[in-house]
Design a protein with these regions (language model features):
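Generic structural detector for well-ordered beta-strands
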Residues: 4-10, 44, 54, 69, ...
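Beta-strand/loop substructures that line and gate deep hydrophobic ligand-binding cavities in soluble
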Residues: 77-122, 127
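Hydrophobic pocket/interface hotspot
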Residues: 16, 26, 51-53, 70, ...
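Glycine-rich portal/gate segments that line the openings of hydrophobic small-molecule binding cavities
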Residues: 37-81
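Solvent-exposed residues in well-ordered beta-strands and their adjoining turns
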Residues: 8-12, 56, 73, 93, ...
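Intrinsic-disorder/low-complexity, polar/charged segments enriched in Ser/Thr/Lys/Arg/Asp/Glu/Gln
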Residues: 2-6, 13, 38, 50, ...
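Generic alpha-helical structural signal
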Residues: 10, 67, 121-125
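Hydrophobic ligand-binding cavity/cleft-lining segments
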Residues: 1-35
Length: 127
């Protein structure tokens, strides 16, 4: 099953791209709610390069790593990556109100489509 989320960021494409691909920026926005945060992020932004984000509950009760491998990069336009046996694509589309950031990803069987869409959308909305 394919799930898509998107948001519009009122900034120029170069700033949006940098914020999406720079570890120092990722730790600022990559959280689904105020009680979670990203404590560390790594990015090797090239095809075959890897990325990871350590996401933790602020109370220390739980955490997990989100990691994958970049499979295609078109600067300022598109990022494709694999994470486990799933894939995702991120599109950056400049428009009159800013840049639309659209993420399409393969869902997983553990959580409902609504839960997955809601979680990914909440993270993207922080961007």
């Amino acid at each position: 099953m394919r799930i898509t989320v998107e948001t519009t960021v009122a900034a120029p494409i170069d700033q949006v791209w940098r914020a999406y691909t720079t570890p120092a920026d990722i730790v600022k926005w990559n959280a689904a709610s105020d009680d979670w945060h990203t404590t560390k992020a790594t990015v090797d932004l090239r095809e075959g390069g890897t990325f990871s984000s350590r996401m933790e509950a602020k109370d220390g009760s739980m955490g997990f790593d989100f990691a994958g491998t970049y499979t295609r990069i078109v600067e300022h336009k598109r990022i494709e990556y694999a994470f486990g046996d799933r894939k995702a694509e991120v599109e950056f589309v400049p428009g009159p109100n800013g840049v639309v950031v659209r993420v399409a990803f393969d869902g997983e069987a553990t959580h409902s489509v609504e839960q997955q869409r809601g979680g990914w959308q909440a993270i993207l909305d922080n961007f």
